[in-house]
Amino acid sequence: MALKTLRIGTRASQLALWQANWVKSELEKRYPGLEVSLLKIKTIGDKILDVPLAQVGGKGLFVKEIEEAMLRGDIDIAVHSMKDVPTEFPEGLGLHCITEREDPRDAVISRGIKFADLPKGAKIGTSALRRQAQLLKIRPDMEMVIIRGNVETRINKLEAENLDAVILAAAGLKRLGFTDKVAEYLPTDLSIPAIGQGALGIECRLDNEEVKSAIDFFNHPATAYAVRAERALLWRCEGGCQVPIAAFGEVEGDQLKLTGFIASVDGKTSVKGSVSGPAEECEKLGITLAEQLLKDGGHEILAEVYQREVSREKEIPV
């Protein structure tokens, strides 16, 4: 391989660095002569920690500055958590690989108590409106507390903020070795994951054939079909990663089943559905399900959510 060096752009959080270092390690194993380096980049989502992400507004809160570094030529590839990646890219950039998915479920961290057994009025820490809406639909008595910070910080908020439970993505907990903290993994039909949850995406310049060829081996076809379907649904709904939209694709053989969910923030109004079809038609399936959900009430739900988001954006200086 002619490529001698490869620069990876990443956020500086503990989980982002684990993910970028995993990609670095896999590249070095495959190409022993390749010199791989990391460049840590602070994004707007990392800088604003005292405001819920839904109130910050906008898309690409954890990727924009990394993409700008790539456009400047400072980095060759970027490693992202797929759930943070917007459905549209700056001109010249694109998602070239989607890695095999880690556990896509949400996990409950509590004092050993399962979700269904938490007391009435329990205070639940979460960083996502998607989780908040789904959990309130099941348990409207609960009080949702929006928490920010890296994985370990959010785990520690169980005690620091006297919460009854904290809900986090299982993938991050497993990657960082925090599985001993988990009281329960929530089934995906109870808490549908975020779009792309558990998978990593590798972004690069679309015209850099040498880099694209070097990273091809990271792509996991079944995961890519599932995530592309989920992202097509999100794109059709014009959603960002901070709205209460969830979707989860599962591939068996050459078939893909996609489940989607749209809800009001309080979980009182929601619509859910699923479609199945050939995995190769993943994007078509995502758009079909999105249109079904929008027709069944999702359009009105999202109009209200976006109106609330716009009014909050006006209050927050960024």
Curated annotation (Swiss-Prot):
<comment type="subunit">
    <text>Monomer.</text>
</comment>
<dbReference type="GO" id="GO:0005737">
    <property type="term" value="C:cytoplasm"/>
</dbReference>
<dbReference type="InterPro" id="IPR022419">
    <property type="entry name" value="Porphobilin_deaminase_cofac_BS"/>
</dbReference>
<protein>
    <recommendedName>
        <fullName>Porphobilinogen deaminase</fullName>
        <ecNumber>2.5.1.61</ecNumber>
    </recommendedName>
</protein>
<feature type="modified residue" description="S-(dipyrrolylmethanemethyl)cysteine">
    <location>
        <position position="241"/>
    </location>
</feature>
<dbReference type="InterPro" id="IPR022417">
    <property type="entry name" value="Porphobilin_deaminase_N"/>
</dbReference>
<dbReference type="Pfam" id="PF01379">
    <property type="entry name" value="Porphobil_deam"/>
</dbReference>
<dbReference type="InterPro" id="IPR036803">
    <property type="entry name" value="Porphobilinogen_deaminase_C_sf"/>
</dbReference>
<keyword id="KW-0627">Porphyrin biosynthesis</keyword>
<comment type="function">
    <text>Tetrapolymerization of the monopyrrole PBG into the hydroxymethylbilane pre-uroporphyrinogen in several discrete steps.</text>
</comment>
<keyword id="KW-0808">Transferase</keyword>
<dbReference type="InterPro" id="IPR022418">
    <property type="entry name" value="Porphobilinogen_deaminase_C"/>
</dbReference>
<comment type="pathway">
    <text>Porphyrin-containing compound metabolism; protoporphyrin-IX biosynthesis; coproporphyrinogen-III from 5-aminolevulinate: step 2/4.</text>
</comment>
<dbReference type="GO" id="GO:0004418">
    <property type="term" value="F:hydroxymethylbilane synthase activity"/>
</dbReference>
<comment type="similarity">
    <text>Belongs to the HMBS family.</text>
</comment>
<dbReference type="GO" id="GO:0006782">
    <property type="term" value="P:protoporphyrinogen IX biosynthetic process"/>
</dbReference>
<dbReference type="Pfam" id="PF03900">
    <property type="entry name" value="Porphobil_deamC"/>
</dbReference>
<dbReference type="InterPro" id="IPR000860">
    <property type="entry name" value="HemC"/>
</dbReference>
